[in-house]
Swiss-Prot record:
Keyword Transmembrane: yes
Region feature Disordered, mapped onto this chain: 535-559
Organism classification: Bacteria, Bacillati, Actinomycetota, Actinomycetes, Mycobacteriales
Protein name: Probable alpha-(1->6)-mannopyranosyltransferase MSMEG_3120/MSMEI_3041
GO cellular component labels: membrane
Keyword annotations: Glycosyltransferase, Membrane, Transferase, Transmembrane, Transmembrane helix
Knockout-associated phenotype: Cells lacking this gene still synthesize lipomannan (LM) and lipoarabinomannan (LAM).
Main localization of the protein described in the UniProt heading: membrane
Annotated EC: 2.4.1.-
Location in the cell: Membrane
Ranges of Pro residues composition bias in the record: 535-548
Membrane topology designation: Multi-pass membrane protein
Record's function text: Catalyzes the addition of alpha-(1->6)-mannose residue.
Transmembrane regions listed in the UniProt entry: 41-61, 81-101, 202-222, 247-267, 300-316, 321-340, 355-375, 386-406, 419-439, 455-475, 480-500, 507-527
Length: 559
């Protein structure tokens, strides 16, 4: 009974995928012109976002480089206008991304270089803008500085370790001033290097962290099309839905979140590991002997790819732990190649687990931070996130109790709903791992669904967490239902999610900026209605079927 349910569940998930034609017809001249205009429309949006961030972004409390500069300081004096600019720019970029979808999912598609140019064009304006949508980067600076001073960032927070009057602590939100670091030692080790390089210069440190984000995005862009090719998905389709997703520009590039590095290392590691597992030659060449020639070294290439992939995935978990799920699906793919037996399962899990523990031990020892991160994984649970269904249910139940006069039991219900959510995550992930082990599900698809379930049932969900699932699934899932749902979620969260720096604005300012942005976008649509592909492109007229030439004796029997 259980086996049949597993087969049915894994089969229903497997139906999200269907092979696509990797090569499609190129765009015609009219479509290329329309695509370029659309790309420019989106780039204009990111420029507006960057300008608006001078007033509406998450600027530092001290060492603000725009302070006192006549032109650059103007947006901070008209914050509602600045918020309108960032909101309008984000909507323009999201709509341009949506319009580009017809040139990546249709019968004629953009080339890889055209999509890469779009990605770079939309990224550049945000690289020099102040942080947006989050102040987490200032927590990164403070926690790294604590480590530089020789203190343990997993025991003390910025207020205790640096003092309330420190330049980094002043820019950290009050909620996080007393909390220890919830990030892995690799990320804090990188932060230590940045702090040692830049000292207490906030602007230089922020730009260095944005450079780290850019490296992570580069790894994402490198790995996603290769994983898509491995799964039988068109490269430009996967790149458009994943790395070109508006949430990546808004929250990873503009928001400077370490998810970029986590996802980049995880996806690159998954690609290398699967490259070794899917190789035609054996993983372990026989007989086992030290290679003495180039040909013999090449026989070890599949094993080298597998080990390199496992190391990269383990490194990604030392930025944020959820990416370690990828190693589980790689282990199941390896066990399936070895026959899917219990022995193969044990050997693959043991060997890859040993590599992972070795990498963690080396990073913990080299950084001097050890394994203290294991005790701060629940730090973010202090946030009550409405995007998390378990948390939302608890908050709603607590409010019902208050209305009925039963008291506020939100905290108690939170403990129950979050525990149930974690239990459901463990069941879902175990189910998916077994499906990959039996060969019913591709490991990339299993990883994407597992991360999607983790985000959905996680105690705390932030808008950028959605990219954990969207990017790997973009390389595997092709069904219109999945892509349509992903597009809808992206637009809803991207447009109606958090403002550029929501804690600084009143409800009146947010409402006014939203209305002004809506009017501005509608005017832009009206002005560009005939120049941009707002309407579906008409299908080319069908050619009438050619009549076959009559045979010589076609009318032989006619009177």
């Amino acid at each position: 009974m259980m086996a049949s349910r597993l087969s049915s569940f894994s089969s229903s998930i497997a139906r999200w995928h269907g092979d696509e034609h990797a090569v499609a017809s190129p765009l015609d001249d009219a479509e290329i012109l329309s695509m370029r205009r659309t790309r420019l429309f989106g780039a204009t949006g990111t420029v507006l976002m960057a300008i608006g961030a001078l007033g509406a972004g998450a600027r530092p409390v001290v060492q603000d480089p725009t302070f006192g500069v006549r032109l650059l300081n103007l947006p901070s004096r008209i914050q509602t206008v600045s918020l309108t600019m960032t909101t309008t720019g984000a909507v323009m970029m999201a709509l341009a991304w949506l319009m580009l979808g017809r040139y990546t999912l249709g019968k004629r598609r953009m080339s890889r270089s055209q999509l890469d140019h779009t990605l770079m064009l939309w990224t550049v304006p945000l690289l020099i803008a102040p942080p947006m949508y989050s102040r987490d980067v200032y927590s990164y600076l403070a926690q790294s500085e604590i480590a530089v001073l020789g203190l343990d960032p997993y025991r003390v927070g910025p207020a205790t370790g640096l003092g309330l009057d420190h330049v980094f602590t002043l820019s950290v939100p009050n909620l996080w001033r007393e909390t220890p670091a919830p990030y892995g030692p690799l990320f804090l080790w990188i932060g230590q290097g940045i702090s040692a390089l830049t000292g207490e210069n906030i602007v230089e440190a922020v730009m260095c962290h944005r450079l780290v984000v850019l490296i992570g995005v580069g790894l994402i862009v490198w790995a996603t099309p290769r994983l898509a090719r491995r799964c039988g998905v068109a490269e430009v389709s996967a790149l458009w839905l994943g790395p070109c997703n508006p949430l990546l520009f808004m929250h990873l590039v503009a928001g400077i979140h370490n998810e970029a590095l986590m996802l980049g290392l995880m996806l690159a590691g998954t690609e290398f590991a699967l490259r070794g597992i899917d190789a035609a030659q054996p993983l372990l060449p026989r007989p086992l002997a030290w290679p003495s020639s180039r040909a013999q070294w090449q026989r070890w290439q599949p094993m080298a790819m597998l080990v390199l992939g496992a190391v990269l995935i383990a490194m990604s978990s030392q930025v944020k732990l959820p990416s370690l799920l990828a190693l589980g699906f790689v282990a199941m793919a390896l066990a399936w190649r070895w026959g899917g037996t219990v022995k193969a399962f044990v050997i693959s899990c043991t060997s890859l687990g040993a590599i992972s523990l070795a990498v963690m031990a080396v990073i913990g020892w080299a950084s001097g931070l050890g394994f203290g991160w294991l005790f701060t994984l629940g730090t973010a649970n202090v946030v009550r996130s409405w995007m998390s269904p378990p948390t939302l249910i608890a908050l709603g139940t607590g409010q019902v109790g208050i209305l009925l006069g039963l008291g506020d039991h939100t905290t108690a219900v939170l403990g129950l709903t979050r525990a149930i959510g974690v239990f459901m995550i463990s069941i879902l992930v175990s189910w998916l791992l077994f499906a990959v082990l039996r060969g019913r599900l591709h490991p990339v698809g299993g990883l994407g669904v597992a991360l999607g379930g983790t985000v959905l049932l996680f105690p705390v969900v932030q808008p950028w967490y959605l990219l954990w699932a969207i990017i790997p699934l973009a390389a595997w899932a092709t069904r219109p239902g999945f892509r349509g749902a992903t597009i809808a979620i992206t637009l809803i969260v991207g447009i109606f999610g958090p403002t550029a720096n929501g804690d600084r604005f009143t409800l009146f300012q947010i409402v006014m900026a939203t209305l002004a942005s809506a009017v501005t976008v509608l005017l832009l649509i009206a002005l560009t209605y005939r120049r941009l592909p707002w309407r579906p492109a008409p299908e080319p007229p069908a050619r009438p079927p050619e009549q076959p030439a009559p045979a010589d004796d076609a009318y032989a029997e006619s009177p």
